[in-house]
Structure formats: C-alpha cells, structure tokens
C-alpha cells in the first residue's frame, strides 16, 4: 500500500502540491487525473523518492520512501519523457536494469520486444516517441517492481498499443499483484482500466474514490 499523508511541495514559493492525502491499495489500478499543471508529475516524483516533500509523509508498505533503497526497490518510475542512456539499445537497458532489479524478467522482456515490433539492437534515440514509451513500459513491467508509476504513459501510444499494454497490466496484476499508478489529463483514456481515481486540481485533491462509485454519481466529471 502507498500512503500519502498531508504532503506539500513548492517551487519558487508557488505550491505545486498542497496538503495531499491519498491511499493507494495493492493490486489495483490507481488513476491520478488532472489538467496540465495540476501537480500530477510532482506527486509521482515524490512517491518515487525523486523529490522530497516539504511537509507530510509518504510510505511504501509502511516504509518511508525518500533516501530509502528498500522502499525504492518496490517502485519503477516511468517519466513523461522516459530516460535512456545515450546511444543505448534495448539490450543495454536490459543488462543495466537486471543489476538494479534482480527479479527482472529477461525472457519476457525479449518476447515483448518481438510482440511490439521493437528492434533490440536499434539505438533507442532513433525510436519514435511512441516506441520509446513502449520500451519504457516493457522495462517497467519486466522489472518485477510491485508498484509501477506511470506519468502520462499512454499519451503517444496508438489504440492497439494501449490495449496491448492494458492486457499486460491485467496479466501482471493477476500473476504477481502489480499495482500500476497512472497519471493522466484524460479520464476517458483510463476509465476502462482504473479501479480508483484521484482528481487533482491546483495541487490539491478534489476527489478520491472508486471509479464505479463515481460512474454511479449523477454528476458527470470530465477533465479536459
């Protein structure tokens, strides 16, 4: 379980995240929804331990996450613009990641590359944006990390690829209890995969509830 308790973060005296409290249950898909600038990326970076909250606490399965390698081993963070080593190919990334994540699923990794049509020896910097996002997702899924943090991960993927990734998510959740946390500005994009959503606006949580409960509400909530 991921617990955020009253976390706050500012940049240049402007609050990007303001007193946010959210609980993310294991083996569910949690959608963090909000317009650009709502604070989604900042929240994910604090969960990943990249940024430290000015106030509040974040715990991963009861462990504080910032500067805590035991907690960070449970996480894999995919940024909006995924980072890869200069001039690397997919094989280079696999060799590096298995040194960080000992349970990295090597065979699955290469099978996914074939299924998604990604050349393992081609330089990643020659991939399209969508191909880089596919590779980042494959790396995250195969890492064996319990919590997969995805920042606008489905943006740039065509519908067929999105459906393929969603199917893999479902399989990994059933097989090993993986818990995806997906930040997006588009609720409609996630409504067929998320179990629970948190709506962010101007750095604060407007709403956090099960998606089915939200659908039953008479009021239609839409993020544009």
Positions of predicted regions on the chain:
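Walker A (P-loop) phosphate-binding loop of ABC-type ATPase nucleotide-binding domains
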Residues: 35-39
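Helix-to-loop junction immediately C-terminal to a conserved catalytic motif
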Residues: 48
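Conserved ABC transporter NBD signature motif
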Residues: 56-67, 71
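ABC-family P-loop ATPase nucleotide-binding domains
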Residues: 80-135
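Catalytic Walker B motif of ABC-type/P-loop ATPase nucleotide-binding domains
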Residues: 148-152
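Helix N-cap at the start of a conserved alpha-helix in ABC-type nucleotide-binding domains
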Residues: 159-161
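ABC transporter nucleotide-binding domain
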Residues: 166-224
């Amino acid at each position: 379980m991921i617990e955020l308790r009253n976390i706050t973060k500012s940049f240049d005296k402007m609050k990007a995240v303001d007193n946010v409290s959210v609980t993310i249950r294991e083996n569910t898909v949690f959608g963090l929804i909000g317009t650009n600038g709502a604070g989604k990326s900042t929240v994910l970076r604090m969960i990943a331990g990249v940024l430290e909250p000015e106030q509040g606490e974040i715990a991963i399965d009861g462990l504080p996450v910032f500067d805590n390698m035991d907690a960070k081993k449970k996480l894999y963070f995919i940024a909006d613009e995924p980072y890869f080593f200069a001039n690397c190919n997919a094989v280079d990334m696999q060799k590096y990641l298995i040194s960080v994540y000992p349970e990295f699923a090597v065979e699955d990794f290469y099978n996914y590359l074939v299924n998604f049509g990604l050349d393992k020896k081609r330089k990643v910097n020659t991939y399209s944006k969508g191909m880089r996002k596919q590779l980042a997702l494959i790396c995250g899924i195969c890492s064996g990390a319990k919590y997969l943090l995805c920042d606008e991960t489905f943006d740039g993927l065509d519908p067929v690829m999105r459906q393929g990734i969603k199917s893999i998510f479902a399989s990994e959740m059933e097989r090993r209890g993986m818990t995806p946390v997906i930040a997006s500005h588009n609720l409609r994009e996630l409504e067929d995969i998320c179990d629970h959503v948190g709506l962010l606006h101007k750095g604060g949580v407007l709403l956090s509830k099960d998606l089915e409960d939200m659908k039953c509400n008479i009021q239609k909530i839409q993020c544009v």
